[in-house]
From Swiss-Prot:
Stated name of the protein: Peptide methionine sulfoxide reductase MsrA 2
Domain of life assignment: Bacteria
InterPro entries, per database record: Met_Sox_Rdtase_MsrA_dom, Met_Sox_Rdtase_MsrA_sf
Biological function: Has an important function as a repair enzyme for proteins that have been inactivated by oxidation. Catalyzes the reversible oxidation-reduction of methionine sulfoxide in proteins to methionine.
Gene Ontology terms, MF aspect: L-methionine:thioredoxin-disulfide S-oxidoreductase activity; peptide-methionine (S)-S-oxide reductase activity
Active site per UniProt: 18
Keyword Oxidoreductase belongs to the record: yes
Catalysed reaction, written as an equation: L-methionyl-[protein] + [thioredoxin]-disulfide + H2O = L-methionyl-(S)-S-oxide-[protein] + [thioredoxin]-dithiol; [thioredoxin]-disulfide + L-methionine + H2O = L-methionine (S)-S-oxide + [thioredoxin]-dithiol
Amino acid sequence: MDEKAAPGSETAIFAGGCFWGVQGVFQHVKGVSKAVSGYTGGAKDDAVYETVGTGRTGHAESVEITYDPSKVTYGQLLQVYFSVAHNPTQLNFQGPDSGTQYRSTIFAENDTQKQIAQSYIDQLDKAKLYPAPIVTTIETGKTFYPAENYHQDFLTLNPTYPYIVYNDLPKVANLKQLFPALYSEKPVLVLSASN
């Protein structure tokens, strides 16, 4: 099940650990025009990195992806999300980061996205592609709040930062290897070079 390809733009919001790596992956997907790091699941007043980091806000570090469904479908974005961007079997942690703010969650923008995401998870569960159960949740009706500017484009701007080298650059390499038709060498950036 996937959405019908239509010109224009749609948004998808995925959470899967630290947003630096998730953003970095989706910035390299053809058909994506923007991938913004932020917070989803909690209140606006709590959408601040230091507060979200407590794990008590309901927010997850997330990425809002703007894409052209005639170039890349929601289903293809889900494939990248589950195969490259994070490990969907880890409950409330990814790599070295732990807490509910690092949970694996799809924030569906509408009923169609919710149905596609649930169908995809069901297919993965049935195929038993992972050594452990998928713990990814689907939430609806949540507002996305952009993160602070210093979190935007972090992977691209800090390619030698040890966390990025160890945790996130391999994800971009896996995207290129597993989905060469979707891979774009040049990332779409949130901030201009002057910021």
